[in-house]
Amino acid sequence: MSYDLIEWKIESLQIDYQEAICFMQQRIEDIYNGVQKELVWLLEHPPLYTAGTGAKVEDLLVDNLFPVYATNRGGKYTYHGPGQRIAYVMLNLKTRNKCNIRLYVETLGNWIVETLSHFSVKSYFNPDLIGVWVTHGGTEKKIAAFGIRIRKWVTYHGVSINIDTNLSHYSGIVPCGIKDYGITSLRKLGINISYEEFDIVLQEKFNEIFSNFN
């Protein structure tokens, strides 16, 4: 797969969640119809919660803390907000001959693990508790959450990675429906980097990891 066929769109301002959904839905139609390139879209949302298709009412602990959006991605409740890098990935699995959802999710996981490794963070992808995890202070904590949707074999939604996120904002939900584990960020792990620094490595590792994903 030639990587000049993939567009990278990096936002400098926060993007409204509903606007992002509308954009992705139109873009995946265009990708399916062959009139637009595949896209990796890097952005940040204002503070909000999203409820995936597996969300349970009881996992919303505080219903007036931030706006709550029902969404068609897989997964349960999660938080998005400042200090969190969102990577929405829109790839055509069919043209890549990779109509294998599990393989796609694992490849996303490897991408994030390799990116974090560049910053000397040892992490791992857990296929059962979907996400990328680290061991910090003797306990396992999630640093990156996954939620995807596939339509006509074109992917959308993606990954959120905590860079310098206010972790107290997770207090209004049971993140991803998992009660027994915590949430962390690069800042909490002692890694202080900018979005710009992170994005450069994210793109480099994407090209490496996805080079065989075709």
From Swiss-Prot:
It is found in: Cytoplasm. The active site is at residue 176. Pfam families: LplA-B_cat. The record marks 142 as: Lowers pKa of active site Cys. It is an enzyme of class 2 (transferase). Pathway: Protein modification; protein lipoylation via endogenous pathway; protein N(6)-(lipoyl)lysine from octanoyl-[acyl-carrier-protein]: step 1/2. GO terms for biological process: protein modification process. Its main location: cytoplasm. Its EC number is 2.3.1.181. In the reaction, the free carboxyl group of octanoic acid is attached via an amide linkage to the epsilon-amino group of a specific lysine residue of lipoyl domains of lipoate-dependent enzymes. Catalyzes the transfer of endogenously produced octanoic acid from octanoyl-acyl-carrier-protein onto the lipoyl domains of lipoate-dependent enzymes. Lipoyl-ACP can also act as a substrate although octanoyl-ACP is likely to be the physiological substrate. This is Octanoyltransferase. It comes from Ehrlichia chaffeensis (strain ATCC CRL-10679 / Arkansas). The lineage of its organism: Bacteria, Pseudomonadati, Pseudomonadota, Alphaproteobacteria, Rickettsiales.
